[in-house]
Structures are given as structure tokens and as C-alpha cells.
A protein has these predicted regions:
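Structural marker of alpha-solenoid helical repeat scaffolds
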Residues: 35, 68-69, 102, 136, ...
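Residue-level recognition of tetratricopeptide repeat
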Residues: 39, 72-73, 106, 140, ...
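Alpha-helical segment of the N-proximal tetratricopeptide repeat
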Residues: 7-28, 35, 45-48, 52
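Conserved alpha-helical positions within TPR/SEL1-like repeat arrays
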Residues: 44, 48, 77-85, 108-119, ...
Length: 305
């Protein structure tokens, strides 16, 4: 391909990317892809398009070539993310470590390395690398939140609470952190403190369902309870996220049982169960389709052999 044709192809790729036509970019032939191996900006565009269209294998193949030519921290980090998505955990760890060896203060790489280490049960290493992520970037909210979650799962509630509070210090509107502090207080039997933090979580994000569920499980609800009044308003809202709606329905069902209105309690309990079954049916349908694809793949392999 002439330099002029290559320039035209490059311009076309950039235009498609600006138009968010990721599918068209992802379908670019291997021959064309290889022409841009030494052009990091175009490689990133093609890889991002592959990831947007869930063509993870294509992205992985291109990145593995790219790191040979441009062994940068960024390319190794993106390769690590691509491998992580595919549950190729050992390879992802290698890529994140390469990224960090090139750029010692790469906070995001430390954080994602820790995420993979946590996933495979290497908790001590995960704790260390979440702390490294924070050390290299003091306002890394995600690393603080992940560190808090890991401490919580390890039942180190003092450290978990401390790190959730750091999350809130960085972002006072982080409703999950308030809710999780509430859960810790509930586990420790400090129910008034738990209630306070569940309410704070609701105040920060009115449509985050989890603190409502936790609150109604903790308290006996009466009709004067402001949380109950809020629940009645929220469930009338259109376009609620289906998963959130399911939790809201369970929450108000429990509230109506407390109040003694069993008809409405069962009505919302049935609605919640229906949403749950629909979600399970959808997951089962997806699993069946995936199994069919795998089955066809192996049948085709037999035919080829």
C-alpha cells in the first residue's frame, strides 16, 4: 500500500471512530491492522473499537504485537485489562507488572493488578497493591473503595470503615460507601449508627435501592417513617432500573408486612419475585445460546478433522 493510500485509510479509521462506528473499525482486515503496528494512536483506536464490540481476542492479538514494537506502560496496561476481561488472570498479572516496571507510579495499573490478585485469592498481595495505587495517587478513589471492600470481606471492619470514610472525603456523593459503613455498623450490632448511614446513603442517591433494603431489614417500619414515604413515591417512578426495581419492591413489601397491610405486602413481594424469575430466565436463555455456540464450535472441529 502506498503512503497516500495508507494516509487515506488512517483518515477513514479516525472518522469512523469519531462517529462511534466501532463495529466497522473492528472488522478491518488483519492485513490493514498490521500496516499500523508502528502507529500507537491508530492501534489504540482499533483496540478500543474491538473492546467496545467485545472482540476481545482481536484486541489481545493486536496488543501483543504492539507491545513488541512499542513496549510502553500504556499498551501493557491495556493488554492487562483485555486479558482480565477474558479471565486470563495469570497473563493479566504479567502485563500489569510489566506496565508498572516501565512506569513506577502507574496508580491505575497497581489498582487493576490488585483486582486480579483479589479475584484469585492472593489477598495479601492485593492489599499491598491497592496501597501502592494510593501511594502513587493519593486521591485514587477507586483504589480506596476496593481496599475498603477487601478489608470488609476479610472482616477487618476497622480498616474497612476507615477507607470507606476516605472515599467519602474524596467524593461526598459516593452512596455505596455510606451504605457499606451502615452494613459494618449493623454487623457490629451498632444499629442506630447503621440506620444513620443508610439514611445518608439514601439522601445522597434517592434511587439507590440497597440502603432501603438494609434499612427496612434493620427497622420495624410504621406509616410515619420517611423512608416508607419515599419508597411509596419511588416505586411509582417510570424507567426505574429493573434490578433496582426488584430491590425496591422487596423493600416496600417488608414495610407493608410491618404495617400490617398484607394485601399490598404480597402484591409487591409477587412483583419482586416475578422480576427475579424474568432475570433468571434471561440468564438461562443466554447460557443456552452460549452452550449452543460452544457445541457448534466443537462439532465443526470434528468435521474439519
Amino acid at each position: 500500500m502506498t503512503n497516500e493510500n495508507l494516509a487515506v485509510e488512517k483518515k477513514n479509521i479516525i472518522n469512523l471512530f469519531n462517529q462511534k462506528k466501532f463495529g466497522k473499525i473492528s472488522k478491518i482486515s488483519p492485513k490493514i491492522r498490521n500496516l499500523f503496528e508502528d502507529q500507537p494512536d491508530i492501534i489504540k483506536i482499533i483496540v478500543m473499537s474491538d473492546l467496545n464490540t467485545k472482540n476481545f481476542i482481536k484486541a489481545e492479538q493486536l496488543l501483543k504485537k504492539a507491545v513488541i514494537i512499542n513496549n510502553t506502560a500504556e499498551f501493557n496496561y491495556i493488554l492487562g485489562n483485555t486479558l482480565k476481561i477474558q479471565d486470563k488472570n495469570s497473563e493479566a498479572i504479567v502485563s500489569y507488572k510489566k506496565s508498572i516496571s516501565i512506569k513506577k507510579d502507574f496508580s491505575e495499573a497497581y489498582n487493576n493488578l490488585a483486582n486480579v490478585q483479589k479475584k484469585i485469592g492472593n489477598f495479601d498481595e492485593a492489599l499491598l497493591n491497592y496501597k501502592n495505587a494510593i501511594k502513587t495517587k493519593e486521591d485514587n478513589l477507586e483504589a480506596y473503595y476496593n481496599l475498603a471492600n477487601l478489608y470488609k470481606s476479610l472482616k477487618n471492619y476497622v480498616e474497612a470503615k476507615k477507607n470507606y470514610k476516605k472515599v467519602i472525603e474524596i467524593n461526598p456523593n459516593f452512596s455505596d460507601a455510606y451504605n457499606n459503613i451502615g452494613t459494618i455498623y449493623s454487623i457490629l450490632g451498632k444499629f442506630n449508627d447503621a440506620k444513620e448511614f443508610y439514611i445518608k446513603s439514601m439522601n445522597v442517591n434517592r434511587y439507590f435501592a440497597e440502603p432501603y433494603k438494609n434499612y427496612v431489614q434493620l427497622c420495624k417500619i410504621d406509616e410515619k417513617d420517611q423512608v416508607f414515604k419515599n419508597l411509596k413515591e419511588i416505586i411509582q417512578k417510570e424507567n426505574l432500573d429493573e434490578e433496582q426495581k426488584e430491590v425496591f419492591f422487596y423493600s416496600i413489601s417488608k414495610a407493608y408486612f410491618d404495617i400490617g397491610n398484607n394485601d399490598l405486602a404480597f402484591k409487591y413481594l409477587n412483583s419482586a419475585n416475578k422480576l427475579k424469575l424474568e432475570k433468571l430466565d434471561y440468564s438461562f436463555s443466554k447460557d443456552k445460546k452460549e452452550f449452543k455456540k460452544i457445541k457448534e464450535f466443537f462439532l465443526n472441529k470434528k468435521l474439519i478433522n
